[in-house]
Design a protein with these regions (language model features):
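ABC-family P-loop ATPase nucleotide-binding domain
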Residues: 1-14, 224-246
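H-loop (His-switch) and adjacent beta-strand-loop-beta switch element
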Residues: 214-227
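ABC family nucleotide-binding domain
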Residues: 4-217
Length: 246
């Protein structure tokens, strides 16, 4: 039996602006296995951001079913969605979204504070920062850190609650190539060493090429899926599946 952490069935999202309706997603069905690493790609306006918002419990679909880590979240109230987000989703955004007056350690503690966790909060934040190579930067504020280090603080914050999934939206977009590679290696290591489920939303083919599966969106629908596997000599082979395969 498959262990699905994400199950989306016929997800449709319609935005209404006055009398005008914009259909951002059209009957999207997508399953993601626990421990899988995928990329969602597509041109601007393809529905990537809308799908990410739904997967991250930041928004609800207009219709369809979304089950995250065994919980039906499609029709939850705002406060229930907030609880699901805090417990089950870690976010890594292109912009670092750190509190400028707080230390790295305090920034990483935030999800634990929101969850009402008091015991061991500082220890868990410290361990998360050590996991991304920032054990010597606990008391540094964002202004005292490089861009790559700030992004690593955000990764530590994303993983401190042991989420079911981590959503990474263009995680290297604001970084130089060296810092971007360091951040990408940390994220890939979380998947390979700890089985963390990773969903990248990206335009970057380099990121996509290092995942197991690429979901291609076009005009709000899944236009196809590229599956990737590692051959005997370590090189990746890619083959294309038909429209809507997941």
């Amino acid at each position: 039996m498959e262990d699905w952490v994400i199950v989306c069935q016929d997800i449709t999202k319609i935005y209404r602006m006055g009398e005008v309706e914009v259909q951002a997603l059209r009957s999207v069905s997508l399953n993601v296995r626990r421990g899988e690493m995928i990329a969602i790609m597509g041109p601007s306006g393809s529905g990537k951001s809308t799908l990410m918002n739904i997967l991250g419990a930041l928004d609800r679909p207009t219709s369809g079913e979304y089950i995250l880590d065994g919980e039906q979240v499609s029709s939850l109230a705002d406060d229930q969605l907030a609880t699901i987000r805090n417990r089950k989703v870690g976010f890594v955004f292109q912009s670092f979204n750190l509190l400028g007056r707080q230390t790295a350690q305090a920034n990483v503690e935030l999800p634990l504070r929101y969850a009402g966790i008091r015991t061991g909060r500082r220890t868990r934040a410290t361990e998360a920062l050590e996991a991304v190579g920032l054990g010597d930067r606990l008391q540094h504020r964002p202004s005292e850190l490089s861009g790559g280090q700030q992004q690593r603080v955000e990764i530590a914050r994303a993983l401190v609650n042991n989420p079911a999934i981590i959503l990474a939206d263009e995680p290297t977009g604001n970084l130089d190539s060296k810092s971007g590679e360091e951040v990408l290696r940390i994220l890939l290591g979380l998947n390979q060493q700890h089985g963390t489920t990773l969903v990248f939303v990206t335009h970057d083919m380099e990121i996509a090429s290092r995942t197991e599966r690429v979901i291609r969106l076009h005009d709000g629908s899944i236009a196809g899926t590229d599956r990737q596997r590692v051959s005997v000599d370590g090189e990746k082979a890619t083959w294309r599946l038909g429209i809507g395969d997941s």
